[in-house]
Amino acid sequence: MAYPFQLGLQDATSPIMEELMNFHDHTLMIVFLISTLVLYIISLMLTTKLTHTSTMDAQEVETIWTILPAVILILIALPSLRILYMMDEINNPALTVKTMGHQWYWSYEYTDYEDLCFDSYMIPTNDLKPGELRLLEVDNRVVLPMELPIRMLISSEDVLHSWAVPSLGLKTDAIPGRLNQATVTSNRPGLFYGQCSEICGSNHSFMPIVLEMVPLKYFENWSASMI
């Protein structure tokens, strides 16, 4: 999860987030090289005493500055498109969970089970226990099995919301009357925090999301106790 004065991304917990972090580093390297080249050319232009007032055109230079940006854009676009397709691909999910956004809480329904549904509200600051996180804890966590593909169906009952968990590389809009889907896969157990990422009203900041990823046998015990 995030911590104070953090400069980088949160630790990746899912294959998608690992791909996104690699793509971030790949794109940042390209941006750094371009910025260095541009600054170098600007410094040469400001310091050189050579001039070419009689030069009207330069076919070679124009060809280079047309082809080179096209190649750079392709190098950025190809891995980006690959990740987009990976994020939309859902193959044989082990579990389906429907998430509904409300002003200002989330409700969850495990569609593979009968009567396994609940609302998830933020715990007020005055009710927090020692060690719990302000504005991030909820009364009912979303318990999911780790190392299994899980399909999240996301929608809204009222206004636009956005269901986001950064460490899992998830951010899906919750739109009234529309059902969006996303895949959740965690490589390790733990608590993973997120928040509504679409301004949805006065209490937008008080819609946290907490996923509790556990081994499959613990999830089966939890689901049996909830039914």
From Swiss-Prot:
Mitochondrial intermembrane compartment spans: 1-14, 88-227
SUPFAM superfamilies in UniProt: Cupredoxins (SSF49503), Cytochrome c oxidase subunit II-like, transmembrane region (SSF81464)
Superkingdom of source: Eukaryota
Keywords: Copper, Electron transport, Magnesium, Membrane, Metal-binding, Mitochondrion, Mitochondrion inner membrane, Phosphoprotein, Respiratory chain, Translocase, Transmembrane, Transmembrane helix, Transport
TM helices/strands, residue ranges: 15-45, 60-87
Subcellular location: Mitochondrion inner membrane
Gene3D superfamilies (UniProt xref): 1.10.287.90, Cupredoxins - blue copper proteins
Chief location category: mitochondrion
Keyword Mitochondrion among UniProt keywords: yes
Record text on cofactor binding: Binds a dinuclear copper A center per subunit.
Gene Ontology CC: one annotated term: mitochondrial inner membrane
Catalytic reaction(s) noted: 4 Fe(II)-[cytochrome c] + O2 + 8 H(+)(in) = 4 Fe(III)-[cytochrome c] + 2 H2O + 4 H(+)(out)
Pfam families the record matches: COX2, COX2_TM
Co-factor requirement: Cu cation
Stored InterPro entries: CcO_II, CcO_II-like_C, CcO_II_C, Copper_CuA, Cupredoxin, Cyt_c_oxidase_su2, Cyt_c_oxidase_su2_TM_dom, Cyt_c_oxidase_su2_TM_sf
Residues the record lists as binding Cu cation A2: 196, 198, 200, 204
Membrane-protein topology: Multi-pass membrane protein
CDD domains: CcO_II_C (cd13912)
E.C. code: 7.1.1.9
Annotated function: Component of the cytochrome c oxidase, the last enzyme in the mitochondrial electron transport chain which drives oxidative phosphorylation. The respiratory chain contains 3 multisubunit complexes succinate dehydrogenase (complex II, CII), ubiquinol-cytochrome c oxidoreductase (cytochrome b-c1 complex, complex III, CIII) and cytochrome c oxidase (complex IV, CIV), that cooperate to transfer electrons derived from NADH and succinate to molecular oxygen, creating an electrochemical gradient over the inner membrane that drives transmembrane transport and the ATP synthase.
Alphabetical list of NCBIfam families matching this protein: CoxB
Oligomeric and partner information: Component of the cytochrome c oxidase (complex IV, CIV), a multisubunit enzyme composed of 14 subunits. The complex is composed of a catalytic core of 3 subunits MT-CO1, MT-CO2 and MT-CO3, encoded in the mitochondrial DNA, and 11 supernumerary subunits COX4I, COX5A, COX5B, COX6A, COX6B, COX6C, COX7A, COX7B, COX7C, COX8 and NDUFA4, which are encoded in the nuclear genome.
Family per record: Belongs to the cytochrome c oxidase subunit 2 family.
Protein name: Cytochrome c oxidase subunit 2
Gene this protein is translated from: MT-CO2
